[in-house]
Design a protein with these regions (language model features):
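A structural boundary/capping signal
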Residues: 3-240
């Protein structure tokens, strides 16, 4: 037991060192899948990540198969929806609290969603973004108060993807009316494209909240500090 405890402590230190480097990296240097699996192992040191990586590989291959060399916006977004929701069966979890966060802590993490195929706005969006990074598709995370969605953005071609609604597309005006109060509409953070690093910053805020709710205050502070360092203009981070 003491050896296992020592190994866990060593792994924890190594994971935290790697995560602490993220604010200093360029987005192009960050592997989103690898980082999200690190965060999952930080939560559950016994986690086996190979089956999770295999699941992502299957999704990536399915998107490639659905695309068949098409590169127009409609074909790309359709291929993503088909692979993630229709074929693999990923859905919005029905067990959520008043803010829309899963009551099952595991479903706040990538591993929990990949195992149950149920997630919430943030990690369902992250699934799109992982595939986007693997296939060089211009996808971006888009933040709102208590919500997060995906935007395909290639110059003049732009389409929003609502991961909690089977990949349905809604205009920016829909999100503005639904999620932004009058004082938030001029905020420079909301409804803007986030790069990979900024997206992780938004996710770190949510992870900090999970640890805080589980009375792990030091770990909560660790993630919230990272979040604030990456996204200082995010109100959500400051509120948490």
């Amino acid at each position: 037991p003491s050896l296992a405890l020592s190994l866990n402590t060593t792994n924890e230190i190594l994971i935290e060192k790697e995560l602490e480097n993220i604010p200093d990296l360029k987005s192009s240097q960050i592997d989103l899948l690898k980082t999200l699996l690190l965060i999952s192992r930080h939560w559950d040191p016994s986690l086996k990540t190979q089956p999770l990586q295999d699941e992502i590989k299957k999704l990536v291959l399915d998107v490639k198969h659905n695309l068949k060399d098409s590169n127009d916006t409609t074909s790309i977004t359709h291929a993503l929806r088909m692979a993630i929701h229709n074929n693999a069966g990923y859905r919005y979890t029905e067990q959520v609290d008043s803010r829309g966060y899963p009551t099952n802590n595991e479903e706040l993490f990538l591993h929990g969603m990949l195992e149950t195929k149920r997630g919430y706005c943030m990690n369902l969006s992250l699934l799109y973004l992982i595939i986007g990074q693997k296939l060089d598709i211009p996808l971006f995370g888009v933040p709102l108060p208590n919500h997060f969605f995906v935007r395909y953005d290639k110059g003049k071609d732009q389409i929003n993807i609502e991961a909690t609604e089977m990949g349905t597309s809604f205009p920016d005006s829909f999100y503005g009316q639904r999620y932004l109060g009058s004082s938030e509409k001029d905020n420079l953070y909301f409804l803007k494209n986030l790069n990979t690093k900024q997206t992780l910053g938004a996710y770190f805020s949510n992870i900090g909240m999970v640890y805080y709710q589980n009375q792990k205050v030091e770990r909560a502070i660790f993630y919230l500090k990272l979040s604030t360092k990456i996204n200082p203009s995010s109100i959500d981070t400051q509120n948490n």
